[in-house]
Amino acid sequence: MKAFGFLKIAIIFMVSGSSTATIQKTAHPALPTPAQLQKMSSRFSPTPMRVETANLTVADRQALAKLVEAARFFDEIFLKQLWSGNLELYLTLQKDRSELGKARLRYFWINKGPWSDIDDYKAFLPGVPPRKPVGSNFYPEDMTKQEFERWVATLSPAEQESAKGFFTVIRWADKKAGTLAITPYSEEYRDQLSKVAALLREAADLTENASLKRFLITRADAFLSNDYYESDLAWMDLDAPLDITIGPYETYNDELFGYKAAFEAYIGLRDDAETAKLSAFTQHLQEIEDNLPIDSGNRNPKLGAAAPIRVVDQIISAGDGAHGVQTAAYNLPNDERVVNQKGSKRVMLKNVQEAKFRNVLVPIAMRTLSRNAMVDVNFSSFFTHILAHELMHGLGPHQITVDGRETTPRAELKELFSAIEEAKADVTGLFALQYMMDHASAMKLGTVLPSDDAAQRQMYTTFLASAFRSLRFGLNDAHGKGMAIQFNYLVDRGAFVEHGDGTFSIDMTKIKAAVQDLVHDLLTLEAEGNYSGAKEMLDKMGVIRPVLKRAFDRLQGIPTDIEPIFVTAEELVPTVSSKPSATPKPSRKKSVRKK
């Protein structure tokens, strides 16, 4: 839940020895002009990210500088993961100093590629495929799903696991024979990962925090061994002022199967006061699991250890965490072995969320909600629901049995899983918050979760406004497609109401039951590993209907998301390469301060 550019990003690209494809000369409709590219870029509101680091020890501040330097390498790796011709194209764009060249370079850097994330991955540059390859560069661009599946069927169980694993790329061994080869990330990206590993070890030598030291050392080892299990466990135990997430995690860019993880980095400073306050929610997750509106046999009678929550102010993000729509929070790791043993961790990027709320959500609410509903939109409801969303990724079915096989919803739903899972986390988050509001007194949540009628109305109304925000990400984004399911379902149930003037509000007499029913449907799809049912739901509900198109027409000129400018990171470690963006830095008077 994951634009960039005006500040200089230090990326020292390895030109020699890199594997790049010949850029395809593909015909396109008329490509955007400089003015049109500027308009496309303006959908991302430039937002300086300042974080006060004065309270860090000298050692941790020195370690932070090493981590910022390490994070920047992930932009290079991600460029390679997205498309085989990406790095060569980026280097070419930097040489074009014309007005058009500068506009192209800037929008390329926002997307980390030549396809616009929020325009269904449509190409905006010449000489590239008209759309992002569905398998990105995790697989051969000309490989079909059927070719992969036929080849996998010939492998041993261990080889099949590796072929479908998070941390391998697939290449042709002999295309005529239909045979493929498996290459671990540790080999495919060794040049960059060896440098990152060295920087992590330097940071580990500097910090005095034992848990941070252990995570950095084990993650450095993982980058070279391709085994991330021990470092994922160490990440779950991380308890330090510097909050670090760095590695291959999310699989959204693998639209072919949803198997392959992209590299990303988030470096931030923990907000201890907010973290302590929100951690109260984790004490009640088992009770919520026990009351999910799903067949009791599909509930988890014993969740993993209480899921830790971290509220963080982001200093820098990179790689998969730094393109298109920005991540506001995340729930990791995705390794089910770790989730079963230790649960998962929810990280809330508070300064990112504040920027999204201020620059995007409030303007959207002013145009899409009725006047009476508008007063119910507030940041607290927005922030709390994002937390609930991340918590809900850890609830519901994770290990299932299909036709006698032990498997997972992710494995059974394949490329459909991400959209179904994002919809499930959203709407189950509403269900969970409503449950906690209904039991706030018994749960002793009164100080962190208001539960009166006004608070409930504010929660649902803020979610409605945020639905329009998410839907603008486009249907190729798992969050956007997942939100389309929810929006259409709740409109059909009369819970979201459109008025004659084109504005919307909540019908409080219908919303609670509609949410509960949708939670049931989504959780059941996952519990049964029902691929055909998930496809039917997505085909029917994961669409933009006329009611949404009318609403979108009212949102012209409002940014879709933010474009973070990592001011503090730049001050800590000034970059040495020419900046990717061709636009001057905005005035610092817009900077975000969060202590």
Predicted features along the sequence, with ranges:
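Contiguous, non-catalytic segments that form substrate-binding/exosite surfaces or channel walls
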Residues: Y185-M374, N378
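Active-site recognition of the HExxH zinc-binding catalytic motif
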Residues: S381-H398, A425, L430
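An active-site-proximal "capping" alpha-helix that borders the catalytic cofactor pocket
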Residues: N209, S418-M436
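Post-HEXXH active-site segment of zinc metalloproteases
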Residues: P397-A423
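Long, well-structured alpha-helical subdomains associated
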Residues: L430-E536
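N-terminal helix-rich structural modules
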Residues: A27-T207, S211-F215
